């Protein structure tokens, strides 16, 4: 093995990007199969492959960063820019959903009855479950900031407590969203209103699940003393992602639940 004289991480070839891409293909194809043919076989296979990929990819990253010391300040700087670009791409992703919503709602076509919400659609009350969901996510934003400050101050106990509260609030939000979907008086097939509502809020819900998974991994890593007050890159990126999810929900609440109703 040659001696490394630079601060960059020369990553070994990894199969996980390929298996991750294949699992994404299986999940999206499986979602179509579930919607149109009521078969969850492909979707279950895709989810299983995705969970296995996440586990093994996280295992490799933890080994490289925590135990082998490959995440030098130079590498962290590059990863930080990468995370910023990823969040920007997610902003553009949700911009498409908001564009579809406002395009349809600001000038409703005669087929919709010339009004918004369309004739026959009974929208959800924004002051009931959606307002509770807003409170839950805002509280989780406060608790993850508490966790971050506790970690920087070296207070491990408070960091674990705050992170546990954040995870619990994230899971509670997901349960509330699932119950709202179950009790909604309209479906995804109820025209443009149902489509924009369920796709926009559903993709946000998916991001909450991804963020919660990220935070659970950070919690387990903190239990095993992987983070220090100076080196906690993984947790910091998870906190960024969680704040992004918070902000997107505020736009969803104001646009779709409050103004759109």
From Swiss-Prot:
One of its GO terms (biological process) is respiratory chain complex IV assembly. InterPro entries: Cyt_c/ubiquinol_Oxase_su3 (IPR024791), Cyt_c_oxase_su3_dom (IPR033945), Cyt_c_oxidase-like_su3 (IPR000298), Cyt_c_oxidase_su3-like_sf (IPR035973), Cyt_c_oxidase_su3_a-hlx (IPR013833). Its EC number is 7.1.1.9. GO terms for molecular function: cytochrome-c oxidase activity. It is a multi-pass membrane protein. GO terms for cellular component: mitochondrial inner membrane; respiratory chain complex IV. Residues 35-40, 106-128, 184-190, 257-261 are mitochondrial intermembrane. The keyword Ion transport does not apply. The keyword Zinc does not apply. The chain crosses the membrane at residues 16-34, 41-66, 73-105, 129-152, 156-183, 191-223, 233-256. It is an enzyme of class 7 (translocase). CDD domains: Cyt_c_Oxidase_III (cd01665). It catalyses: 4 Fe(II)-[cytochrome c] + O2 + 8 H(+)(in) = 4 Fe(III)-[cytochrome c] + 2 H2O + 4 H(+)(out). Belongs to the cytochrome c oxidase subunit 3 family. Component of the cytochrome c oxidase (complex IV, CIV), a multisubunit enzyme composed of 14 subunits. The complex is composed of a catalytic core of 3 subunits MT-CO1, MT-CO2 and MT-CO3, encoded in the mitochondrial DNA, and 11 supernumerary subunits COX4I, COX5A, COX5B, COX6A, COX6B, COX6C, COX7A, COX7B, COX7C, COX8 and NDUFA4, which are encoded in the nuclear genome. This is Cytochrome c oxidase subunit 3. The gene is MT-CO3.
């Amino acid at each position: 093995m040659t001696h490394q004289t630079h601060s960059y991480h020369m990553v070994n070839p990894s199969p996980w990007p390929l298996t991750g891409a294949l699992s994404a293909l299986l999940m999206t194809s499986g979602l179509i199969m579930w919607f149109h043919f009521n078969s969850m076989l492909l979707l279950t296979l895709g989810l299983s492959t995705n969970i296995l990929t996440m586990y093994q990819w996280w295992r490799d990253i933890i080994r490289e960063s925590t135990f082998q010391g490959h995440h030098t300040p130079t590498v962290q700087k590059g990863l930080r820019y990468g995370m910023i670009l990823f969040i920007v791409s997610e902003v553009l992703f949700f911009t498409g959903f908001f564009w579809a919503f406002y395009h349809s709602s600001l000038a409703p076509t005669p087929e919709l009855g010339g009004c918004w919400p369309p004739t026959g659609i009974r929208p959800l009350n924004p002051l009931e479950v959606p307002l509770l969901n807003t409170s839950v996510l805002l509280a989780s934003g406060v608790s993850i900031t508490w966790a971050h400050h506790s970690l920087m101050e070296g207070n491990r106990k408070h960091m674990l407590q705050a992170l546990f509260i954040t995870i619990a609030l994230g899971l509670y939000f997901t349960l509330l969203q699932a119950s709202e979907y179950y009790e909604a008086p309209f479906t995804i097939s109820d025209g443009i209103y149902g489509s924009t509502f369920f796709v926009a809020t559903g993709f946000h819900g998916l991001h909450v699940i991804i963020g919660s998974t990220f935070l659970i991994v950070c919690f387990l890593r903190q239990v095993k003393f992987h983070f220090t007050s100076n080196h906690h890159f993984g947790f910091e990126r998870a906190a960024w992602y969680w704040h992004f999810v918070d902000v997107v929900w505020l736009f969803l609440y104001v646009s779709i639940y409050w103004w759109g109703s």
